[in-house]
Amino acid sequence: MKIFQWSILLVSFSFVSLSFAQKKEINATVYAQWKKNENQQISSNGRYISYEINPLFGDGFVYLYDTETAILDSFPRGKQAGFSFQSDYFVYKIVPGYDTLRTCELRKIDKKKWPKDSLGIIVLSTKNLQKLSDIKSFELGKEHNFLSYFKNSDELYKAIPVKKKWWKKSKKPVKAIQSDGTALTILEPISNFSKAWLHVTNCELSKNGTYATVTTHQKTKKDSYQLDVFAFAQQKTYQITQQQTAIPSVVFSDNQRHLAYLSSQDTSALKKYDLTLITLDSLTAKAANASKKIVLSDSLKTISMHQNPVFTLNGNLLYFGINDKQPILEKDTLLESEKAHLDIWHYKDLRIQPQQLVQLKQDEKRSELMVYYLHKDLIVPLSNDTLNVAIVKDLHADYLLGSVSYPYEIEYQWESAHRKDHYMVSLKDGSTKLLAKGVAFDGKLSPKGKHYTYFDSKSKKYIHLDPLTMNEMCLTCAQPSINWQSDINGMPMDADPFGIIGYSRNEDSVYIQSEKDVWIYSFVSQQLVCLTEELGARNQQEIALRLWENDSVFIDRSNVYFYGFDQLTKGFHLYDFDDKQGLKKLYSANSSFVQLLRSPNKKTLLFRQSTLEAYPEVMFTTNNFLSLQTISKTNPQQAGYNWATVELVKWKSYDGIPLEGLFYKPENYDATKKYPLILYYYELNSDNLFSHSAPKPTASIIHPTEYASAGYLVFIPDIRYTAKGPAKSAYNSIMSGVDYLLKTVPSVDSTRMGLQGQSWGGYQTAQLITMTNRFKAAMAGAPVSNMTSAYGGIRWGAGINRQFQYERTQSRIGKTLWEAPEKYIENSPLFNVPKIQTPL
């Protein structure tokens, strides 16, 4: 009997050992197995949650979870899912199979003949599923229960073929209407309401679904567009305009009293546009004054099609744009290749020529902002060719904030903080009032126009200005030890402030973010108080205010929660706030915070967190984190693979700076063995201790899980940059970390160490192998080898030069090439190539 028991025990141990030993290695062949959890949604009533799980290649699923019944449904090839406004039906797009589309592409089949998307509609009370074919796009209402969808084809129903008779009957064929539009349907599945149109190019529904606009198109000798309004209550269609050559924009006011649209009857390429205002009540009453064309007083200006009309939230004002009228060029007989094109360059240009060329189309579309008073029939100009004014929909005052950049634009070539002059712009008459000159970071004008606050980069303090009296005062001078600026890790530039969060509803206070806490300045008591009671500073947490909904221009404390990143553990804390009790901890974990959504009825929270080992699955709570339920399982196959473990290591650089780094080991790590070591680096990474690293293709960087799975140790040290320059700073940080590991981890094989970096990390790799020969091999992706030549290079995507990068930002030289040529040479790997012995 004992022999039998020992046999069972030995067999059990054998199975355990075999199971662990048989864990597979992660490599490029398994990328397709790993999936992503995407597009998480929560219904308005908080009962339903949906998400997608999609592989790198292949067909995914959309999932629907009922939090009351705990039933999880899945639907193959589902994408872009959403819930109706009233949470009574669920919609998702059904895409064709991956293999089907791949076959079509391989066989070079015309894309018009490829299988099309479908639409799945589920009535949640009955779980009945309806499928609609040939879907181009769909849209759900945010504050109404309608669903609108376009088909790819311009037909509602396919004609049923009629059986042919033996005799022929001559009949004049009906000429098919040619159109750029397709079939549109507006549907309400619960009430079974459905309305369809043909030849539709655009559809807009009003905020709560009282009206819908339908723009239709027919091709005749010229394009012919027609705009109609459908009133759901009357079940009637009202024609707004027809025989237009373009209707590029249609917009409802939020109060659903008015409609504005742009249109043109010109047949030329340079069209002149009209802006027309429709009073919807008058339209449905068939009143003669339902339509009003907005006329400009300046005959040299025209309505811009590049600035969509925007109503203010109260519906009293309408923003729109104007342009200079463009001359119509006379036709000629020259070929395009025979025409001369002239570019004029000047050394005093505010933008260099490559940047001008990149931004040419943007400049051509630039509009001057105007505002129209609906009840006064008054147009007020707000901006011009130098003054930029930001549109505010939720207006609470007669002022907007404007900015002028042209006095400083030429210095943008070498400065990273872009200075601007800030103005208060009157909505009543367009007059401007200078608030502050040379503001390097965004200032904030309060919604009611009582306060203007900005961060002064010279004094490193927040300054308040009373726009009425122009009196200034310092808001943060009472707290000189508080850090209001972000960590820029040695870049020779002005650091960004953490920012002005916003103003209270009655504008008696302003919320300001510091490095570790949230502060509130009272304009009544003229005192700066820490709203978070300096909990962040005491506990080494970076506590930040976050909004549940971005639906107000004010800070409402019932709409906030607080997130705290723990600088010591790299975990996080979530807090609620009570005016009497202050911060109240909701949840904390040694993991990485990924996502938090709240249902509109505030009953359900959707939550995601991760660690290196644990994928950020979809979780939910209905009791403020007293309990959490996990509902997704994205990558169960991970259990069969040799994964990685990670630990936070701490040491000091050669020049005494405290440093941190991430040290990864294989899951099956054996401390008695020797392992090769791979180093990867890019600025600061230790805060990513709990980030999940899933296998996937990369752009020339390494994934530590993949290398650890293959039997490597991976070290990702933080690099702290000092005035010694990027080369010496990187050397002191990286090599001191290597020495620390060799001293404390005997399993590191010092004869088999490698370097890997991409972009700025690639530069560090190229530079490091000119300074040491301790590494067996190195890989430098997209490095800069010669800073002297790169200094005047062009970033072709933006058209800007790289000068600022070396003088102010990541390259951290801090001087021009002529002021310190020795620094550019010292920090350029090219000039020390003869010293390199490491295979690269």
Question: Locations of the language-model features?
Answer:
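Serine-hydrolase catalytic-loop signature spanning alpha/beta hydrolases and amidase-signature enzymes
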Residues: 685-687, 714
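Beta-propeller folds
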Residues: 20-616, 620-621
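C-terminal substrate/ligand-recognition segments
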Residues: 445-447, 454-455, 567, 608-612, ...
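Short beta-strand element of the alpha/beta-hydrolase
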Residues: 673-684
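Bacterial Sec-dependent N-terminal signal peptides
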Residues: 1-25, 784, 793, 801-804
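Conserved hydrophobic/aromatic pocket- or pore-lining residues that grip, position, or stack substrates
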Residues: 369, 618, 651, 661, ...
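Active-site-proximal cap/loop segments of hydrolase catalytic domains
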Residues: 694-840
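N-terminal cap/lid segment of alpha/beta-hydrolase-fold proteins
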Residues: 632-673
